Amino acid sequence: MRAFKVTRDTNETKIHLELNIDGTGKYAITTGIAFFDHVLSSFAKHGAFDLKLDVLGDLEIDDHHTVEDVGIVLGKAFENMEKKNIKRFGWAIIPMDEAKATVSIDIGGRPYVVGGYTPNTEKIGNFSTENVVHFFESFSNNAKINLHFEVTGENEHHKVEALFKAFGVAMDMATQVDERKGIVSTKGVI
């Protein structure tokens, strides 16, 4: 079983995460940011990851540190995963009403993010939309994953939710075990 626990305790956040990559999509997420909980739940459900996340952040300031540090901790959990026999690449195109999100991933040990997301509104509830790209940067840098994404649409809720669903589906695909694969790199290491 590929299950990991990661804790982060700083002056800005206190986070405890439990991730089972080979889960069934069960989740219990409490970040203090309702919409962020919602999209992380969508990530877990559509990625079939069991995810438990308890966060106490400095939300009296704003949501930046909480969103950033969740990306860091989730990234570290995936970085701990054994890379031998994984499919390595994953992608998804997910519609949600008028919105469409595309995500492609390479679990190749090289963090890099190319993101096409321009928010039409500053907030969805108490979630700052400017933090969407920052979440994916924090995740990628700590998971050492190359991540490309694009999203179009009018409704901000639909755009961000479609993006997190696509992220879950693509990560599920890339983390699947295929015993034929070995290390999927001509270098022999990831």
From Swiss-Prot:
Q: Where in the cell is it found?
A: Cytoplasm
Q: What is its main location?
A: cytoplasm
| GO cellular component annotations of the record | cytoplasm
The Enzyme Commission number assigned here is 4.2.1.19
Give the UniProt keywords, A-Z.
Amino-acid biosynthesis, Cytoplasm, Histidine biosynthesis, Lyase
Keyword Cytoplasm recorded:
yes
What name does UniProt use for this protein? Imidazoleglycerol-phosphate dehydratase
User: What is this enzyme's catalytic activity, as reactions?
Assistant: D-erythro-1-(imidazol-4-yl)glycerol 3-phosphate = 3-(imidazol-4-yl)-2-oxopropyl phosphate + H2O
The gene name on file is hisB
EC class of this enzyme? Answer: lyase
Q: What organism does the record attribute this protein to? A: Methanococcus maripaludis (strain C6 / ATCC BAA-1332)
Return the similarity comment.
Belongs to the imidazoleglycerol-phosphate dehydratase family.
Q: Name one Pfam family in it.
A: IGPD
GO term, biological process aspect, one:
L-histidine biosynthetic process
